């Protein structure tokens, strides 16, 4: 059994129930002091694989090589996933195509990261106050041009952990799937 198939089925159920968190994940990396750090990102289904779009100016871009984890929780179906994965850079053609479909504000932010300040940089108080105005005034280049720092990652999971919460007297159900020599090995776990 491929746990990615189960993941997508559970996610589809959450979407059917209009769960606002169905497309979100917490993308977890390690900072320089080995502290875990997480940020909520949109988790995408890219041709049956997991992917995220991020900006190369983000600290996450450099931290990804130390390994990443994802966590999702969908309250509508009471299911949590923890996923460990390695990453591969998404095809730049896919980035170009997808980037053009983004709303204007995220596009402007990508250009802001490219031309003004990188993502996660500290702002002086005056800069913070004027950020919304500065973004509004930012003129986007020709639509065929995509910032060099716009990027994405294809996630290559090697471990899934699924927790199904259960009400009443039933214990929660917890399973782990580990990729071993190209095959998924299943383990039932104590919840």
Regions picked out by a protein language model, each given a short descriptive name:
Residues 33, 58, 76-78, 91, ...:
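Residues that cap or initiate secondary-structure elements
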Residues 28-32, 44, 71-75, 163-165:
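A generic structural motif
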Residues 80-191:
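Charged, gly/pro-rich active-site loop segments
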Residues 1-47, 51, 55, 62-64:
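An N-terminal domain-cap segment
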Residues 18, 73-74, 112:
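A short, aromatic/hydrophobic, helix- or strand-capping loop or linear motif
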Residues 22-24, 48-50, 66-68, 149-152, ...:
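Short, surface-exposed beta-edge/turn micro-motifs
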Residues 10, 72-74, 184:
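Tryptophan-centered motif/residue detector
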Residues 44-82, 86:
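A short mixed-secondary-structure module that forms the rim of ligand-binding clefts
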